[in-house]
Amino acid sequence: MNKTYTLNNGVQIPAVGFGTYKAADGKSADVIKAAIGSGYRYFDTASFYGTETYLAEAIRQSGLPRKDFFIASKLWKTEMGYENARDAFRRTLENLETDYLDLYLIHWPLPEPGYENWKELDRETWRALEELYAEGKIRAIGLSNFLPHHIENILAGCTVRPAVDQIEYHPGYSQEAAVQYCKENGILVQAWSPIGRSRVLKDPLVCELAAKYRVSPAQICLKFAVQRGIVPLPKSSSPERMKQNMDLFSFEMEQEDIWRLATMPQSGWSGEHPDQERVYF
């Protein structure tokens, strides 16, 4: 699986990545090592995940050169602001045992719901990323969980346009307005939680399509992203499912089925929204 997309600055990015959130809950790099063994080369981490050092260990032990990997990380809500962002980036490089990142994102647009000066804070943070990009320390810069009104604020004052916006995206929560906005503005959408939750995997439509195409319900969810030009970032601790989650190019869904998935009633939402308190189910 060598399919890639070209970002708006010409950088090539793999079409599927591996999400490392909770990938080191056992305080070991074993899950990430298994993902490398399963063929993943694009890894998505974040300072908040606590997995940067485990990813570094797994890459070091793989024996593969750094250039074979596409490594993305994010700065957390408490690391926003110009100086904080530069400090956060330096810590991330140390944790990852590398001298550059392929992609660096602002994790959330607001440090907390209701934060009044978020526009200024976001622009200040973005300026730090632009400088790091200009210094050659990051190959591409982007956003995470930013909705159109947040992105507009960045675009109004940036010198480097965001290459990526990583949002929650899966059947039952496909954030169509945000996806459309990003596509119109040359921003590649990435999907976190691309499989949704167990409710999505058990959804009658998802199961019907899995039977129709002779794949797993998870593969239907991931293909839903891929077929719409969105990069899914699945995570799994099972080597068998890791491989399955990469096998997305041996089948194609009919357009009618894509529309059916896109118009499913809301299901499997994480409860997270950048402008509001988290909802717990």
Model-derived segments and their meaning:
Residues 1-69, 196, 281:
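N-terminal binding-site loop/beta-alpha segment at the start of enzyme catalytic domains
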Residues 8, 56-66, 93-98, 155-158, ...:
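Acidic (Asp/Glu)-rich catalytic clusters
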Residues 23-26, 44-54, 78-83, 112, ...:
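Acidic-and-aromatic substrate-binding clefts and catalytic sites of carbohydrate-active enzymes
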Residues 24-35, 81-96, 149-151, 174:
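Short, acidic/polar
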Residues 42, 100-103, 140, 164:
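Residues at the N-termini of beta-strands
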Residues 66-79, 103-109, 166-169:
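A short, structured active-site edge motif that brings together acidic residues
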Residues 85-106, 131-135:
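CE4/NodB-like, metal-dependent polysaccharide N-deacetylase domain
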Residues 111-281:
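Beta/alpha (TIM)-barrel catalytic core signal, keyed to glycine-rich beta->alpha loops juxtaposed to Asp/Glu
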